[in-house]
Amino acid sequence: MKKTAKQIGAYGEDIAEKYLKKRFWRILSRNYLAHGKEIDIIGYRFGVLTYFEVKTRSNDLYGKPSDAVDYQKISNIRTCARDFLNTYRRGGRIPVFYPFGIEIPRKIYKQRIDVIEIYLSPDGEIREINHIKDWEKKL
């Protein structure tokens, strides 16, 4: 059975989350919604608060996955990011959860927007994962 774009997107986000956790990212939120906008994954590592846009492709018909992350999408992510910070930041820190439910407020030294491109084979196998840091600077 052929998967819908929404199913492929959710599968890609699952892959991205596992990829990030293996690289010691703390996942603060998935599919964070605010003002009708969404951030796929919000993560924290080594003082960097990162808003991840995950793009998954199973063919090359629409170009590279990152081609879909334009100025409008960046603007939407910024809108959500402001809401996230207004909701969770206290005294320049955000709560980061560790194993056994331990919450430690962590300082934010930098924020950025990254894109994670996921390329799948037609049968859904992972072909490639490409983590593009500081996507805004590449537009």
PLM-predicted stretches and their roles:
Residues 35, 46-48, 123:
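Short strand-connecting beta-turns/loops that link adjacent beta-strands
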